[in-house]
Amino acid sequence: ENLLPFKVYPLNFVSNEHQLVNIYNAVDIFVTPSLEENLPNTIMEAMACGIPCVGFNVGGIPEMIDHLHNGYVAQYKSSEDFANGIYWTLTEPDYPSLSEQACRKAISHYSENVVAKKYIDLYNKVTGRNA
């Protein structure tokens, strides 16, 4: 039984990249209520589609979501603050800026080229090579 005040569309496992992008682009925000995360791919995927995100201040989430710039970082285990984050994100007058900042963050920090360069720099540092 759905106790939420809006329709819920359950999704099965999605492996098709185009279908996944369409799903992200059909939503206004992405929320992750997880209390244990490192670097969630789902946040990166949503941000790459320009979707502001809401998550708890745990693991790598606060490194990914810039509080009040591309989403909302709620106090750890505070369901009230988490709900406030969802409300704030949905009602933010400058939602287009949130969306743009989410996309920019994904590209500037998590794109394949950026991540590959970070790995190369790390390997060069560890091996004492200069590239």
Describe each model-derived feature in a short phrase.
Residues 35:
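Aromatic "clamp/platform" in nucleotide-sugar-dependent glycosyltransferases that forms part
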Residues 22-27:
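Short alpha-helical donor nucleotide-sugar binding micro-motif in glycosyltransferases
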